[in-house]
Amino acid sequence: MSHLDNGFRSLTLQRFPATDDVNPLQAWEAADEYLLQQLDDTEIRGPVLILNDAFGALSCALAEHKPYSIGDSYISELATRENLRLNGIDESSVKFLDSTADYPQQPGVVLIKVPKTLALLEQQLRALRKVVTSDTRIIAGAKARDIHTSTLELFEKVLGPTTTTLAWKKARLINCTFNEPQLADAPQTVSWKLEGTDWTIHNHANVFSRTGLDIGARFFMQHLPENLEGEIVDLGCGNGVIGLTLLDKNPQAKVVFVDESPMAVASSRLNVETNMPEALDRCEFMINNALSGVEPFRFNAVLCNPPFHQQHALTDNVAWEMFHHARRCLKINGELYIVANRHLDYFHKLKKIFGNCTTIATNNKFVVLKAVKLGRRR
């Protein structure tokens, strides 16, 4: 846990999933402080929109203004709810919207934590363009190293005149005034042909590797299991290419597509609808934090290409949680398959959790591993 003192309220905040005491990661950053310093309670008029509030620092601080928290991360929503409870703030004070929803009209203040991908930022700025006015105060913040010329040009192109502040605690702010510049329409998704198939893969703005098949998934697809039955999971499904391939290779199985990103789940659904519509009745689509709340002993197999970062921070906490959830939800003799960068040494992590691990394939960059749930080992 970490403490954030600001002009609105003193907060105790924690990350979600929680980090361990040996390698603690803070649930807020200097950019959050810097953004809050720009606001005065008496100056806030109209709806407050907060975009990409990773762990709820801004939403908790401004809770009395009934802000809208907008983003593409269910984990961020869970983190914000947990931090609201931790600080004794009514959860209903914050309204949650995903990035594809319609934003509230004529906001008084818009606070943006600059996301990792320009594609998501552009999608969000285009959505804001439909609702902001010249009187809306628009401020974005990030680590100074994460604000580039391309970031500023995007604000200018979509919204209007843009300036930056001096760096403070290695954070920088962007101030933008809306003046409705001329702007061509843009497609909601980026599409490309998947080599070796007749499939066209559609990707919403925040999908990992949205402009082409990432090399980890390419390697994984060469070693996926075949002729499985029952329910199998594409965990952290992204655009759903792994799940699509599983549907093709396992015609007797049902595939559950799971991701914490609403845009990823929407992309997976779209890709099944457009490429294998006849398989829709063998699919389930789930926005979730890994397999939280899913009953134990349900699945025959779980397949996963786990992330090793959360927002801008490198961490294996998300992967560790995925592995534990997979073990809980697998049937006895159910199998977990993962692909990962070799340097992450997930072999020993899986062996610790499952009591076994087998290397299925390896190259100079990636490894495909399999672990089997052998019993009720804790």
UniProtKB/Swiss-Prot annotation:
GO terms for biological process: rRNA base methylation. It is an enzyme of class 2 (transferase). Its EC number is 2.1.1.174. The keyword rRNA processing applies. Coiled coil: none annotated. Keywords: Cytoplasm, Methyltransferase, rRNA processing, S-adenosyl-L-methionine, Transferase. It catalyses: guanosine(1835) in 23S rRNA + S-adenosyl-L-methionine = N(2)-methylguanosine(1835) in 23S rRNA + S-adenosyl-L-homocysteine + H(+). Pfam families: MTS (PF05175). One of its GO terms (cellular component) is cytoplasm. NCBIfam families: PRK15001.1 (NF011577). Specifically methylates the guanine in position 1835 (m2G1835) of 23S rRNA. HAMAP family: 23SrRNA_methyltr_G. This is Ribosomal RNA large subunit methyltransferase G. The lineage of its organism: Bacteria, Pseudomonadati, Pseudomonadota, Gammaproteobacteria, Enterobacterales.
